[in-house]
């Protein structure tokens, strides 16, 4: 019996859609689409303390999620053109996420873990809890770009006030494909927001 699966594979510099066919003994893999990816530098408000005339623009880094979505859809169409598909899997980098409003619509592009705002969030958290306490709860090595610190940094941004849901990048794409907003545990465990013992969101 033949089984055909499609993999959506997104990395920090490129993405691709692959079609795999398993005949019970061997797996044949073929590429259906490939497209570029990378954080986009987005100018923000001007810094009033900058020495240059008019101030220096603060730069944020965001993912062009709609360009990725277009590349994914093209790949899925090509995969379907080549034959029926039994399942779709999604693999992306961790920690980054999209914010959704109360109607389930995306609020702007997802911020990139390469943005300087991550360090601001990390400093605020570590002023309250030390890294050993955090490790005891989430089991993660300290990294300033962990989702926990990004979510704290969100509190200083207006769009976060409109957000009702946050979905990690693969969960966001799965939501767009299926209409179901869910969090997958193994990826959620990279956020720093999951209790490593309880294997659920940490209320603290």
Regions found by a protein language model. Give the residues of each.
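N-terminal glycine/serine-rich phosphate-binding loop of ATP-dependent small-molecule kinases
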Residues: 1-109, 136
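Glycine-rich phosphate-binding/catalytic subdomain of phosphoryl-transfer
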Residues: 46-47, 54, 76-204
């Amino acid at each position: 019996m033949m089984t055909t699966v499609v993999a959506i594979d997104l990395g920090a510099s490129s993405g691709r859609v692959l079609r795999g066919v398993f005949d019970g003994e061997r797996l044949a893999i073929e590429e259906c689409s490939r497209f570029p990816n990378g954080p986009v530098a987005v100018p923000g408000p001007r810094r009033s303390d900058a020495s240059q005339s008019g101030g220096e623009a603060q730069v944020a880094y965001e993912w062009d999620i709609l360009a990725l979505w277009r590349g994914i859809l093209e790949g899925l169409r090509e995969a379907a053109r080549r034959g029926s598909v039994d399942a779709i899997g999604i693999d992306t980098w961790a920690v980054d996420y999209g914010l959704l409003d109360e109607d389930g619509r995306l609020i702007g592009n997802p911020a990139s873990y390469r943005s300087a705002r991550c360090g601001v969030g990390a400093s605020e958290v570590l002023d309250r809890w030390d890294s050993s306490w955090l490790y005891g709860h989430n089991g993660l090595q300290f990294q300033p770009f962990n989702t926990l610190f990004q979510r704290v940094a969100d509190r200083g941004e207006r769009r976060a006030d409109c957000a009702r849901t946050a979905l990690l990048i693969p969960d966001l794409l799965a939501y767009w494909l299926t209409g179901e907003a869910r969090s997958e545990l193994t990826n959620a465990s990279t956020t720093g927001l999951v209790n490593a013992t309880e294997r659920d969101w940490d209320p603290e």
